[in-house]
Amino acid sequence: MHLSGDDVIVWQYGVVKLNQTIVMTWVIMVFLAGGSAFLTRRLSSGIRISRWQSFLEMIVTMAMQQIREIGLRQPEKYLSYLATLFLFVATAVLFTIIPGYEPPTGSLSTTAALALSVFVAVPLYGIERVGFGAYLKSYMKPTFIMLPFNIISEFSRTLALAVRLFGNMMSGVMIIGILLGIAPLFFPVLMSVLGLLTGMVQAYIFSMLATVYIAAATKSRDE
């Protein structure tokens, strides 16, 4: 059992290698894109809507309400990005029920890429909200001496996001691998269920931390 899909080479041409992590990342992205298109193909803007559309709207409303409670006044502007983060991590976890599947989130390269997207999104949303000059000045609050510390803080929390998600996902894979050698039937099933629950919690925490960072960039920086 491999701890990471990085170790499994699916295709290679010279120095160019395509590992399982990259393949499964694209599989998840295609699955989410195709699933979204399929589930929303019959949505209506009219008065009469289906029960399915009513259910989807209820979920979207709940998500926007939670985003608003964190501090983002216009949650619809951020919902697509934050929901994509959650759905990607959650889907990567749910696919672990497939035999032989290794979640791409068990690779530091994937979690680093997700954290990097948050690192880029935070200043973009902040600049869009308060302007380029005001956003840059926020790094010198309450005094210009804080500039290097605020910059270090931006990088350190990005690293923390990547390592936190990677550590939790990798630990689940390692525990299941160990228990497979002890009790090939009972323990892996139990740990798989617990792993799914833990993974969903991690997906939620990751997206909520991204929401908090964006809220800090668009709210507190403008005060």
Curated annotation (Swiss-Prot):
TM region positions: 20-40, 78-98, 107-127, 173-193, 194-214
Keywords annotated in UniProt: ATP synthesis, Cell inner membrane, Cell membrane, CF(0), Hydrogen ion transport, Ion transport, Membrane, Transmembrane, Transmembrane helix, Transport
What Pfam families does the database record attribute to this sequence?
Answer: ATP-synt_A
Q: Which InterPro entries match?
A: Alt_ATP_synth_F0_Asu, ATP_syn_F0_a_bact/chloroplast, ATP_synth_F0_asu, ATP_synth_F0_asu_AS, F0_ATP_A_sf
UniProt keyword annotation of DNA repair present:
no
Family, according to the entry, reads as follows:
Belongs to the ATPase A chain family.
Q: What is this protein called?
A: ATP synthase subunit a 1
Q: Which organism is it from?
A: Prosthecochloris aestuarii (strain DSM 271 / SK 413)
Q: What is the lineage of its organism?
A: Bacteria, Pseudomonadati, Chlorobiota, Chlorobiia, Chlorobiales
Gene behind the chain? atpB1
